[in-house]
Amino acid sequence: LIKLNNLQYNPIKLDFLEDQNYSLDSLVSNFDFDDLCKKYKEKFGFSKIKTFSFSKEGFLGLFLELKGKIAVSFGECEALIQGAKLYESLGFELTWIGLNKDGSVNYQELKDKDIDFLFLSSCVMDTFFEISLDDVKNFTNAKIISNGSAKIDSLSDIVYFDNYKLCGYSLSGVILFNDENIFELLNMAFIDTLAVKCCFEALENQKFNYEVKEKFLEKLKEKLKDNIYFFVDNKKTLPYTLHFALKNIKAREIIRTLAFDNIFLSNGEGCSLGLSKPSRIIQAMGYDETTSRNAISLNFLQDFDEETILKIVDKIEQKYKQIRVLD
């Protein structure tokens, strides 16, 4: 199995017998869960933890708890974007921060804006274009709320995690913060302790390979020549990710055919979440829907030797040519 889509979907094995220790009882001490919360604090530096439904309704709930003016980047995850649109539909004001043609966030749209909370992560979804939160803080004093599933930045004031991406199950999202006046803490019966446990395990075991990207990219260029192109500069994306596009085919065609060879790629969230939609991120960068269907997103967790890299690239080239001939 060659999984190059782990940042979109990375199932882990759950031990339900051990998980019985995370059933909270109001009449006894809950040592295992208390210890787990301490581990979160030691690892990430946040003292408060809560869970929420990782859906548009769940994000709507977070928006309604925030006492202040909110801005959301178009480069964020699908559930957040849908939640923000739902928030707007109820009559609340919200500021949208767009993406530039090169995939970066348009910081200029933050200028002179009265914002209290900014939903902005340290990388853009799908392309994994890196965002400098240090630069962002030159444009706004808003508290930054970030998705830490692919990368965690110490400059984020609040961090949340997508359990579906981290462990493969649609468990609650986990959010970490310090100021209890921002979000209301949950009563014991409403904490999704399994989500908290699975999230931590996934983050503890999360490993990335920083060596494969350049080798893989070089082989792709050699084999595919003029048939490969790029929406973003891969020197500006996370060092364990790669984003490219193939001319004149829909990414889903090559994704489906490679799956039969146990090689798993992604076009982005719209593909991995089963929405059957092309990358919304590429469209937010100013490209049309048809063009966005060409995009392919990879990430590297494991190490691959030269022979394996060549084997994967050869298979991509072979399937690409077959699809072009059939078309």
Residue ranges and their predicted role:
Residues L1-D327:
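Pyridoxal 5′-phosphate
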